[in-house]
């Protein structure tokens, strides 16, 4: 498999060569302290038209001096902004790009990275204004998952087989599930919703009318906290409100008639995992 980084021009080669699963070809997360926060709301309409993009999301520690003592930069995003990118950006190989020790204090938020799928059969851009914000809903390739599960679940040594975290979530299996637990299982109806915004905080109303009518789902909502903010200038100075690691996690029952009212902090975002009960 090839996942090319730096300036490889995206021309849709992955459609000809399926082992070309993605490339960067964008100012990725390592530039997050210097680029306009609205950059990530533009890329779905520009760079991503040329194929999958490995943006290396998932940076929870935004103070760059923790990684490089000489740096005074602070990244311009919140934790929930980073979670939202796993949905708004398409890449069949996603990264958890931070140091493991930076995730340890936030394992409840890291759960979304474990649960989110990486390949989709349906993608819906629910609302967007390039340069300002974007909200995307995606549905994993459950038909392919079911075919894989049928084969893997029948392996003689299936109890030794590892089940990916995303597959575990889609099938409603426990954390310690093995390949043998997939036998006879069918994927539940699962959706993921992600949103990110620029330096302006905003509230969006997300209709869940893409869910199956008459079905009840459980939604886990990862949202910016009331005091969250990822807004900071290029020199690393802030207005005293910089609080990128503030977030809330709530669980609620939803249906196709539900509308979620979700707040995004400045440079913030949200992520929602939705699974049929």
Language-model features: where?
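Flexible loop/turn segments at secondary-structure boundaries
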Residues: 9-14, 62-64, 95-97, 104-107, ...
